[in-house]
Amino acid sequence: MSVKELLIQNVHKEEHSHAHNKITVVGVGAVGMACAISILMKDLADELALVDVIEDKLRGEMLDLQHGSLFLRTPKIVSGKDYSVTAHSKLVIITAGARQQEGESRLNLVQRNVNIFKFIIPNVVKYSPDCMLLVVSNPVDILTYVAWKISGFPKHRVIGSGCNLDSARFRYLMGEKLGIHSLSCHGWIIGEHGDSSVPVWSGVNVAGVSLKALYPDLGTDADKEHWKEVHKQVVDSAYEVIKLKGYTSWAIGLSVADLAETVMKNLRRVHPISTMVKGMYGVSSDVFLSVPCVLGYAGITDVVKMTLKSEEEEKLRKSADTLWGIQKELQF
């Protein structure tokens, strides 16, 4: 008899059932692993699968996480180059793609990443036809559109991490300026993740007190306190971090785990994430932009109708036109 047989008496033969709350992360670069560790620390899954094309790196990352199992509450961590390891996932997070180079605009990355998605998405769909897709790779709004087109999924099941991070950065910087924790500082960045994002100044508040009502010049050129700079810092922050350390990882990893928590626990929290906005705010093309969305187990169920100033709406439409200009040129 083996030690196991001497130690344990089996009382019930378990049917081999698959995981119920499985999450897959595609791409084990800095962003993918930051997403993985953030998700593991929040105990969101009963199985975590990692996929990448670089097999040594992939196995190394898996082993490194498995060796920390004692300190985690996720019983199964698996990995593979073959997408069969992703089978029965509830949520699939796509972080794979060509990395943004210093000074390179997010939009420049597009076609390089479309070609990668043409391989990834059909494989994900094959093994998890009922999953939700969360796209993180940049340029995220265009690649969310690409994932939606290739997958054939309904639009509520394909989301982009979008402005969830931009809004978090905004709230952090707002908190630094006011000496208040970012949880108590409210403000929304919508539109394109990145260079043409739109700050909704009318909604910026602390404890329901509108900063714009207190100080009408907020966010305008006449603003002596330079609040407009806060938004500029949000836009520049990724470029600054890339310049300093070569890539961004921790903040986006935490932001993605925040979205994963809302989905896996069906919290129905409102997040500024990338969704199909055709028919909203005068947008007439098939583009994905960030607007406040009610998110849960089924994906996006509702969109909050924000009251925007005409110039804010104009900026959104301009973003949509820019994105559509690029999307219509893409080779699928």
UniProtKB/Swiss-Prot annotation:
InterPro entries linked: L-lactate/malate_DH, L-lactate_DH, L-lactate_DH_AS, Lactate/malate_DH_C, Lactate/malate_DH_N, Lactate_DH/Glyco_Ohase_4_C, NAD(P)-bd_dom_sf
Enzyme class: oxidoreductase
EC id: 1.1.1.27
An annotated Gene Ontology molecular function: L-lactate dehydrogenase activity
SUPFAM superfamilies (UniProt xref): LDH C-terminal domain-like, NAD(P)-binding Rossmann-fold domains
Quaternary structure, from the entry: Homotetramer.
Name of the protein in its database record: L-lactate dehydrogenase A chain
Organism (species): Pelodiscus sinensis japonicus
Designated gene of the protein: LDHA
